Amino acid sequence: ADTRSYESLKNKTAEQGLTITHPKPGESLDFGSSKIEFYGPITESESDRNNGSIVMKIIYGDTSFLFTGDAEREEEQEILSAGYDLSATVLKVGHHGSKNSTTYPFLCEIMPKYAVISVGDNNYGHPTEDTLSRLRDADVKVYRTDMQGDIVATSDGKTVTVTTKKNENAQTNPTENEKSTSAQST
């Protein structure tokens, strides 16, 4: 990454005699009573920044959170092929819910209870109906920042509690039947 923010970070760390290291797939860090496992990017590419996203899981007790950045189908397939344990309580849905992320095979390995889609107004149609449909089919409770604002998932090591800043009961992933019922009542 060569954004201005990253360049500034590199300069500040160099001024302090520090270096930036990038985690590699298969590496892990103990972080207090939690653990962070890194799964991607498997293949780094300057030309494909989405698939160059860090994919990592934070494990705390019996709960875990999988963060997929903007990883798309190709990176998901490479991670699946590597054989990592991707199961997670919470999935931060990849690439704002684009049709090229959170593929069915990837989702089947994760089987999350909750999914968080970080998305705002956009011209790309994110999150796409394809991705929302896959999450519905897997019976995953969906939270969306565009509808619910800040979303906080808290773990006590046994269970995860999710709270939202607004509209906690929003229909974040309605079925076609729910959509038509809602349209008829307005």
What do these predicted ranges mean?
Residues A1-T186:
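Non-globular, low-confidence helical/coil segments that flank catalytic cores
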